[in-house]
Amino acid sequence: SLYDIAPVTPGVAVDLSHIPTDVKIKGFSGEDATPALEGADVVLISAGVARKPGMDRSDLFNVNAGIVKNLVQQIAKTRPQACIGIITNPVNTTVAIAAEVLKKAGVYDKNKLF
C-alpha cells in the first residue's frame, strides 16, 4: 500500500502498478491511514517536510515530530506487530518519538523499530 494525506496518492499507485511485477499496489489518501495499514507487515515512514534553506534541525523537528507521532499512533492501533522503519528527519529524534508512542500503547518491541 501507498499512503499520503495528498489526494494524488491513488494516482501515483496506479502509475506504480504499471511496473511489470506481480506486486499489487493500492493507494490511499486522507487523514486516516488505517485502510493502508491493514495487513501490513512492514511500514516505512518517509513522511514530513524536507529541510529548506534557513531551516534548522529544531524547525524540522517541530514539523515532522507531529506527523510521525500521528502515524505511529495509527500503526499501534491497527498493526502493532508490524516492523516500522523511519526515514523522516531528524531521524535520531523521530525514531525516539515513535518508540515512546509505541511504549505508551503497550506494543513497543525494540527489534521491530528501526
UniProtKB/Swiss-Prot annotation:
Entry annotated with the keyword Lipid metabolism: no
UniProt keyword list: NAD, Oxidoreductase, Tricarboxylic acid cycle
Disulfide bridge partners, by residue number: none
Residues the entry annotates as binding substrate: 51, 57, 89
A biological process term (GO) from this entry: tricarboxylic acid cycle
One term of GO molecular function: L-malate dehydrogenase (NAD+) activity
Main enzyme class: oxidoreductase
Name this polypeptide is given: Malate dehydrogenase
Role description: Catalyzes the reversible oxidation of malate to oxaloacetate.
Catalytic activity: (S)-malate + NAD(+) = oxaloacetate + NADH + H(+)
InterPro entries in the cross-refs: Lactate/malate_DH_N (IPR001236), NAD(P)-bd_dom_sf (IPR036291)
Quaternary structure, from the entry: Homodimer.
Cited Pfam families: Ldh_1_N (PF00056)
Family label: Belongs to the LDH/MDH superfamily. MDH type 1 family.
Gene (UniProt): mdh
EC number(s) from the headed UniProt entry: 1.1.1.37
Record-listed NAD(+) binding positions: 4, 64, 87-89
Cellular component annotations (GO), alphabetically ordered: cytoplasm
Keyword NAD: yes
